[in-house]
Amino acid sequence: MNQLVKLIHEQPNVENTIPHTLYQASSPKLNLAEEDKFIIYASGDKFSLSTNTDLSDLNPVSVSLFVLNTNFIVWFNRNNVGIEIAYPAIIFHGLNEDSIYLNIEDNQIIGTYITIRCNPESQNNQNPLFNIIDSKITNVYEAISYVSELHAVSSDDDYDEGEVTGIPALEISHTNSELESSVLNSLNNSGQADDLDDNMINDNDGIHNVAGMHVDVGFTSIAGVKTRRSEQEDYNGWTANLNSTNKRNKLH
């Protein structure tokens, strides 16, 4: 079984990584498993990290973030080392003003509860990728939500096709090519669970909507989602019908 959370010693670079907009223009149908280059949806080098475990010699004050099609990377700028988190390991991700909250599967590297915050004083990462994509924390959160959704749908399609035909599916359902046809920053991600009302929770910029519940996590209120499929996903005017999996939630 592949390790879902692991230490890495090389960060994404311009040689092995392309922006999602460039990928959309050349290859509108996303195959998460068989691309020879990483696809980057959001990144930035002005962040800090806190976690519920001892990070040993790692300095969490200055980190860079990379949201790729394959995984989410936290890069420790002062240590020149990173932690790669596979999307199936992310149980919950939430946004609270200037913080991203992650609950990930049990591991021996970075702990299970992670908070990422903006840090304008973070040490500069000289990676040229940041000249192409330098994202705000809200964009990072939206990118994690979007790619997590792709992986959830891909996993379910693999299961469904294997159950019917006896062979694994290689690609995401074709409906997701419509999702890939627009720029991520225009994401309008809305949904409604069975036990929720019609109230929509808006991001600070008033653009993005999320349906969910409030849950007290002991130190703050966070709007977020669990890994799931929604019945409909509206992505910049393109509507794609997706199969239903886990419900979307908002922490109280």
From Swiss-Prot:
Signal peptide: none annotated. Its main location: cytoplasm. GO terms for cellular component: cytoplasm; nucleus. It is found in: Cytoplasm; Nucleus. Coiled coil: none annotated. Keywords: Cytoplasm, Nucleus. Belongs to the LOT5 family. This is Protein LOT5. It comes from Candida albicans (strain SC5314 / ATCC MYA-2876).
